[in-house]
């Protein structure tokens, strides 16, 4: 009896939700922005995102709340439309958003697999060991890790780059909290800035490229604005770096077999994706998935030739009496592509799914249209894009960029590049504003903190504004100023 009362209560609640006059039967999407179900969906998304922002405190993966929120939002939407006997409209909208996610997810999965393969082959360890052996001063280390972050992130993505450079700093300056915090702030700014002028540097730039709004070569016009965004705060912070030499640490790292060839295959994969998109007008994910095939064939080659390679190396080590090398050879395991796939950042990919589906659902309800009218018609696009860059420091740049793409505002090419820049570098204003910042707070826990980053926010903001000014000046013709 109690369960029947619960069912009756739930049915009554659903009737209340779906009985407002706005739900008139129509083949077109309904405007639900003023309905109770619309407000409930907004509340669900807000609660989910508050939980995401509290990831560090709650020790809860950020994908969990948005996955549940996405399900609840689309279930509510589905109930609305099926009550009006037009379920096909909801199904088509859901499949459209799912397809957008699937293309981006597969693209990112291949990129992450290659990065994990290069990490397993010890390419990044070798780079770190080289920097450590050189015995650079703190000043040199500050600038080298910053510039390497800026130039590696367009290829290896800003998150991977930041983690690599932070590992170098933590190894060399072990225990020096002040210097580690300064370097981590510098690395986050540099990695985010470097990722802004490449479709492979950040998820947001990849989204813009996949949407066909910016060609791959056109991202390069953001190079100088991004460089300014990095250099201004770096120059100021460098005055606070002590001019002394850390103790030299020797670390010998030997590249595993095939490391450089996998790097070559990664570059070939990127080239394949670019050619598919630019010459054949096919989604870039086709080229990336083909590139995963390159890696699988090479993995097969490595496994088939492993016994012969080990025999040659073992014979050489025995002739030289190198017991350490013989010990290492005894622990060699075959290269496995699928183990690299399994090590992809699945929490990030699932978080991305949740965000895409949540924002897609809110857009289907009509809220993105309202936001577009408020931002891009109530304001001019330049002001709107600058504001959205600042907002991305608080609520992450992925939902911000996806919302803008879903709004499809009428903007010049220069304005699309502007939102690409601001969403990419705006996250540097706070440590929680980018994946790189959040990751380093975990990797350098106790050294790099929210407030340690926050005290540099004013000078970072100056770099943010300066980069926008440089873009508006250098790329003025893209804004149709002289039309």
Curated annotation (Swiss-Prot):
GO biological process: sodium ion transport
Annotated compartments: Cell inner membrane
Keyword field contains Membrane: yes
Name assigned to this protein: Na(+)/H(+) antiporter NhaD
Keywords: Antiport, Cell inner membrane, Cell membrane, Ion transport, Membrane, Sodium, Sodium transport, Transmembrane, Transmembrane helix, Transport
Chain ranges passing through the membrane: 10-30, 34-54, 63-83, 98-118, 136-156, 221-241, 260-280, 282-302, 349-369, 386-406, 416-436, 456-476
One GO MF term attached to the UniProt entry: antiporter activity
Role description: Na(+)/H(+) antiporter that extrudes sodium in exchange for external protons. Can also transport lithium. Has a low antiport activity that functions over a large range of sodium concentrations.
InterPro entries to which the protein is assigned, alphabetical: Cit_transptr-like_dom, NhaD-like
Membrane topology note: Multi-pass membrane protein
One GO location term (cellular component): plasma membrane
Activity sensitivity to pH: Optimum pH is at least 9.5, the highest pH value tested. No activity is observed below pH 8.5.
Signal sequence interval, chain numbering: none
Family from the record: Belongs to the NhaD Na(+)/H(+) (TC 2.A.62) antiporter family.
PANTHER family per UniProt: SODIUM/PROTON ANTIPORTER 1-RELATED, SODIUM_PROTON ANTIPORTER 1-RELATED
């Amino acid at each position: 009896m109690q369960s029947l009362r619960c069912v009756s209560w739930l049915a009554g609640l659903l009737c209340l939700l779906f009985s407002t006059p706005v739900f008139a039967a129509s083949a077109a999407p309904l405007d639900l922005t003023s309905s109770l179900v619309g407000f409930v969906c907004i509340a669900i998304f807000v609660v989910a995102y508050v939980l995401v922002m509290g990831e560090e405190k709650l020790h809860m993966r950020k994908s969990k709340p948005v996955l549940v929120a996405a399900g609840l939002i689309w279930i509510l939407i589905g109930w609305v439309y099926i009550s009006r006997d037009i379920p096909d409209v909801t199904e088509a909208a859901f499949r459209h958003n799912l397809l957008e996610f699937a293309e981006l997810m597969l693209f990112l999965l291949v990129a992450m697999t290659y990065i994990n393969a290069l990490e397993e082959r010890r390419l990044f360890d070798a780079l770190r060991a080289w920097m450590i052996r050189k015995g650079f001063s703190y000043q040199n280390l500050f600038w080298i890790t910053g510039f390497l972050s800026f130039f590696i992130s367009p290829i290896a993505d800003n998150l991977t780059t930041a983690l690599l450079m932070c590992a170098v700093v933590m190894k060399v300056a072990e225990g020096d909290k002040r210097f580690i915090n300064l370097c981590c702030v510098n690395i986050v700014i540099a990695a985010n800035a470097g990722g802004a002028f490449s479709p492979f540097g950040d998820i947001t730039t990849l989204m813009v490229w996949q949407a066909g709004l910016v060609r791959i070569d056109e991202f390069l016009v953001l190079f100088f604005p991004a460089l300014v965004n990095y250099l201004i705060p770096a120059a100021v912070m460098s005055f606070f770096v002590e001019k002394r030499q850390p103790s030299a640490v020797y670390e010998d790292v030997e590249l595993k077999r095939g490391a450089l060839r996998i790097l070559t295959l990664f570059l070939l994969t990127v080239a394949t994706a670019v050619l598919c998109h630019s010459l054949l007008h096919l989604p870039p994910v086709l080229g990336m998935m083909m590139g995963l095939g390159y890696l699988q064939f090479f993995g097969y080659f490595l496994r088939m030739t492993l016994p012969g390679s080990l025999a040659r190396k073992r014979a050489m080590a025995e002739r030289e009496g190198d017991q350490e090398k013989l010990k290492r050879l005894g622990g060699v395991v075959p290269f496995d592509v699928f183990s690299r796939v399994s090590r992809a950042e699945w929490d990030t990919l699932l978080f991305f799914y949740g965000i895409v589906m949540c924002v897609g659902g809110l857009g289907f309800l009509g809220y993105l249209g309202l936001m577009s009218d408020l931002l891009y018609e109530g304001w001019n696009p330049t002001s709107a894009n600058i504001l959205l860059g600042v907002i991305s420091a608080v609520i992450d740049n992925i939902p911000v960029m996806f919302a803008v793409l879903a709004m499809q505002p009428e903007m010049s090419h220069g304005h699309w590049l502007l939102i690409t820049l601001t969403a990419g570098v705006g996250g540097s204003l706070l440590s929680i504003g980018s994946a790189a910042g959040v990751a380093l707070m975990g990797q350098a826990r106790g050294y790099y903190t929210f407030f340690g980053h926050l005290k540099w926010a004013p000078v970072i903001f100056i770099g943010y504004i300066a980069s926008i000014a440089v873009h508006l000046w250098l790329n003025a013709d893209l804004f149709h100023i002289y039309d």
